[in-house]
Amino acid sequence: MKFSHNWLNEYLGDTQDSQNLADTLTLAGLEVDAIEPVVAEKVSGVVVGQIKTINKHPDADKLNVCSVDAGEDELLTIVCGASNIYEGMKAPVAKIGAVLPGNFKIKKSKLRGQESFGMMCSEEELGLAEKADGLMDLPIDAPVGTDINKYLNLDDNIIEVDLTPNRADCLSVYGIAREVSALTKTELKNLEIPEPKVVIDDTKEVNITATDACHAYYGCIIKNVNNKIQTPLWMVEKLRRSGIGSISFFVDVTNYVMLLTGQPMHAFDLDKLEGRINVRYAKNNEELTLLDQTQVKLDCDTLIIADDKKALAIAGVMGGLDSSITDSTTNIFLESAFFVPEKIAGKARKYNLHTDSSHRFERGVDPQLAKKAMKIAIRLINEIAGGEVAPIHGAEDLANLNKQIKINLSIKKLNHVLGTNFDIEYVTEVLKALHMDVATSFDGNCIEVIPPSYRFDLEIPEDLIEEVARIYGYSKLPETMPKYAAAKTNISETYQSLDTLNMRLIDRGYHETINYSFIDPKFDEFFFADRGIAIQNPISQDLSIMRQSLIPGLINTFKANTSRQQNRVRIFEKGACFKLQDNQRIQFDRIAGLAYGELLNINWSNSKKVDFFDVKADVEALCNDLTSLSFEVCNDINWLHLGQSAYILANGNKIGVIGVIHPTVLKNFQIKAKAPIVFELDLDVLIKRQIPNFTKISKYPSVSRDISFLVDKSVLAGDIIKAIKALNINILKDVSIFDIYESQDSDRKSIALNMLFQDNLQTLDDKVIVESIDKVLEALKTKFNIEQRV
């Protein structure tokens, strides 16, 4: 929102300089982005002048010799080449000694032998415009000899405020003035709402069928207006200083009223309208040519203004070309309305548009402003362009327009939140300065507040507390240490914190990553048989499917790292995954990791590449609280390498997978590095910590025995361990494999086991140990056909 400081002062008086004003607004939450002078460089020695006579230059066809009244005793002779001059014209005159932008000093000069005692100026030469085709044509009532700085109010600054979406009430000069009045305790001048001088009875019937989207629509017919009238200079300048160029008189008036009040308006050519005015939703694919000459096909959820034959405008966004005002328009239909913000939001973006009107209607316009703004516009048109004014006519839903929100605010709560000691009188004074209705409750500690119609962002007590803090000044609030009431928190011993899981992987050299929850459809298709959940409005096409696993994201991160010369990668991620199950969207949490490259960072000792068993050890460390972790061969996951992958089980239930990424994955996704090892686990299982049972430590010595045997290569070492543990030998405390040897010349392999025996009641003798070992060997011979080595 840009505005002229001088224009603001018309409603406040000369309050403070622009920098102080900017500081006041910024500290109150209305951030000022920029302060710029109206002219970048000051002008001096320039006055209002009037051309008395014009004669052709004797030696130059394109030059004229003018006699100019600059308010001095004698007329000035000035040579001028502008094409738009005429006798009686008033224009800025730079006298000898004047200084223009660029430190351009005016001196007495000769042009083709003709002396010139000054220069008549265009907007460009005064620094008011980047380009101008001729002299600046001043109004005929401009006082000759008046300093141009004073006449054009050039001692002014343009202030630009970056408003948050909830402060649509400040998208107008008067809205900013209201705010400054409350902040500085300056008297706010009333906005004059003149009653139109009605002289004809013509009206247009208004029919609102989209009552959920439009709560008020007013129209006014003005006939026989002067279509040759030029926009007054004062209005052109106010528009320019607000960042809006002059287009035509009627458009300029609606823009001026919008900047002043915040109410967007539109003017139609009355003679191009057929029948009633209808506020309705568009028919699907209904066509409309807009003012910028683009043709759009409308969707059925787009609110439009139409007559009985055709669409006229996209409501709250932009008018149509076919009903627009032209140079030949003499009869106009002026529109002012209140549209529900939610029904306008997003419509401009849908049709690749952004207008000042849509910017305001999307954020919300004062529902009680439409008719007031129309009265201001009617008076301006009538006074400047003449015409015969008809009554304002329309349709309105007063119940919605006059809807009020009542908020109960506790002064005790306000002081508790802000750390202040405000009394009820001060809080009431602040809220009344913001034009709120305030009533005190019977106990004197609570007030009932009704916000003004334009402050629809105020709904709950906390909103009012913020308003009091803003007006009082955030910088003046007392600094107090936050109060913390310590309360005993019962944390279950069966819960494992996510931070603990994080640290277990970080301690083993992993780095946490965070990827999008969306993946490329080609990843989804390759990794999963069932298609994932599609996103209706994706960021991009390659992020349009909700992830069913964390692995695709880790592989993408792995690719990005290895393509940038990272030869050792350890990454993990935890997060939500999503899938369709029985036509229901299911969300579940996972933790996954990826390892690649050297086992250790570069050092003086010989290193080795990370392998399956290294990552298996990482998984075992991560699952330290699971008392019955095991692994089972996995042959049915297409993106893991056959023979180098396994399911991870807890208490016999599958909770995850581990394995080497299949080479086809690397090929399909153009990854040049060798295959990494990955794992993924059900996070819900890991955070449910298993509490170990107490086991008494034996005071008797343990006995260790080794056995070695041959077994078929197809037999898994893990199955042998399971078979031994299934015998439930009480004195067998632990069994582990310490050597495996395989020969190319044999279909059998050698496995060496270590068994640890201990009794809680007595010292073991060899006979008991031998019996236990024999029991183990007999079971293994029966199940796996082992052959003991001696």
UniProtKB/Swiss-Prot annotation:
Keyword Ribosomal protein carried by entry: no
Coarse class of the protein's main subcellular location: cytoplasm
PANTHER family on file: PHENYLALANINE--TRNA LIGASE BETA SUBUNIT, PHENYLALANYL-TRNA SYNTHETASE BETA CHAIN AND LEUCINE-RICH REPEAT-CONTAINING PROTEIN 47
A single Gene Ontology CC term: phenylalanine-tRNA ligase complex
Residue span(s) of domain B5: 402-479
Full protein name: Phenylalanine--tRNA ligase beta subunit
GO molecular function terms noted in the UniProt entry: ATP binding; magnesium ion binding; phenylalanine-tRNA ligase activity; tRNA binding
Cysteine pairs bridged by disulfides in the record: none
Alphabetized InterPro entries for the sequence: aa-tRNA-synth_II/BPL/LPL, B3/B4_tRNA-bd, DNA-bd_dom_put_sf, Fdx_antiC-bd, Fdx_antiC-bd_sf, NA-bd_OB-fold, Phe-tRNA-ligase_IIc_bsu, Phe-tRNA-ligase_IIc_bsu_bact
UniProt catalytic activity: tRNA(Phe) + L-phenylalanine + ATP = L-phenylalanyl-tRNA(Phe) + AMP + diphosphate + H(+)
Record-listed Mg(2+) binding positions: D457, D463, E466, E467
Gene: pheT
Family, as annotated: Belongs to the phenylalanyl-tRNA synthetase beta subunit family. Type 1 subfamily.
Upper taxonomic lineage: Bacteria, Pseudomonadati, Pseudomonadota, Gammaproteobacteria, Thiotrichales
Keywords: Aminoacyl-tRNA synthetase, ATP-binding, Cytoplasm, Ligase, Magnesium, Metal-binding, Nucleotide-binding, Protein biosynthesis, RNA-binding, tRNA-binding
Compartments where located: Cytoplasm
Domain spans labelled FDX-ACB: 698-789
EC number, as in UniProt: 6.1.1.20
HAMAP family associated with the record: Phe_tRNA_synth_beta1
Protein's UniProt keywords contain Magnesium: yes
One example of a Gene Ontology biological process annotation: phenylalanyl-tRNA aminoacylation
Broad enzyme group: ligase
Cofactors: Mg(2+)
Domain tRNA-binding, chain residue ranges per copy: 40-149
Subunit relationships: Tetramer of two alpha and two beta subunits.
Cofactor binding description: Binds 2 magnesium ions per tetramer.
